[in-house]
Amino acid sequence: MTSAVFGAILAIVAFAIAAPLAGRHLSPALATRLLVPASVATAASTVFVLGALAATWLGQLPAIAAFGPWSTTRLDAADPVPDPVAVLSLVLLTVTTVWTVTWGARRVHALLAVYRDYHHLSPTGSVIVLDSATVDAFATPAPAGQVIVTAALWDALTPNERRVVLAHERSHIDHRHTWWTLAAELASTINPLLRPTTAAIRRAVERWADEDAAIRVTDRTLVARTIARTALLQHDRRSGPHLSQAATGGDVPQRVRALLEPPPRRRPFALVALCVVLAVTAATTLGVERTSDHLFDQADTQIAHQHHHHPL
């Protein structure tokens, strides 16, 4: 079991390193659609590996073994996982569970606050201009998505620049970017090694909206100029809620540089490399599952009894 767990851990670390690098060489939409489910799957693999390690120690406790068919003596004899490693895995799993539940409760509270504060202002899909001196524009989460622009920013923009901002924010709503980002944050909450991947996903989401805006207004230079100008105008703190998607989010200089270049091309090598890492992660996690099952099968008193009376 030790080798299976070691392989799974190496695969998880490899994904955590490779994913942000691959994200730079994929189109923003593809990067988001690939990295988010891959991150969630890797986080799930992390939980499974920790659980499998913890189970080897928990299964030796008489109170737990009473609910199963295995022998604590046989399990202890067959278990290759040192007790300190298993106990540490249980502690990490417990802390991760508590932290994730706390994170989830805070995000639900924030989502409800966004809905409470903005849903009554105007029908879904419309543009709301807030009377605020803060320069900002953001989109509330779909399906009840709304584009919010402060009066300070709205008045400072030209009509064409307003079109860019609205196209950018509507892209966030149309493609449910808030939910993609939340899923990535969930994964990195479970496994902190995935935080760089979550940051790459946030950048990809903003770039995705930039590319959509460039398609809608048919002028990449205008989009780049609008993003840069909006960032310069934003001299104060944002007024938008934490769960909103803003036009000035992400790495603004990098976004501007990308818009001044041709649309991103497909990079099959990055896609293939990431898929290979994902396949290895899945295979090693399955290996941990099979090894763990075999370990408990060895300790199963019923199976041992059958083998004793029916030798091969």
Regions found by a protein language model. Give the residues of each.
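Alpha-helical transmembrane segments and their immediate interhelical/interface regions
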Residues: M1-A22, T181, N191-R195, A199
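Cytosolic-facing loops and C-terminal tails of multi-pass membrane proteins
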Residues: T2-I9, V13-I17, V85-A110, R229-L312
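Transmembrane alpha-helical segments that serve as helix-helix packing and pore/cofactor-lining elements
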Residues: A16-V81
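Membrane-embedded and juxtamembrane structural elements of multi-pass membrane proteins
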Residues: L26-V49, T97, R107-L274
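Juxtamembrane extracytosolic/periplasmic "stalk" immediately C-terminal to the first targeting helix
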Residues: L30, A63-P69, Y115-H120, L295-H305
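Transmembrane alpha-helices and immediately adjacent membrane-cytoplasm interface residues
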Residues: S45-F48, A52-G59, S71-R116
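Short alpha-helical linear motifs
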Residues: A55-Q60, A187, V205-R207, G249-D251, ...
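Short C-terminal domain-edge/linker segments immediately following a structured domain
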Residues: A65-F67, T178-L182, V288
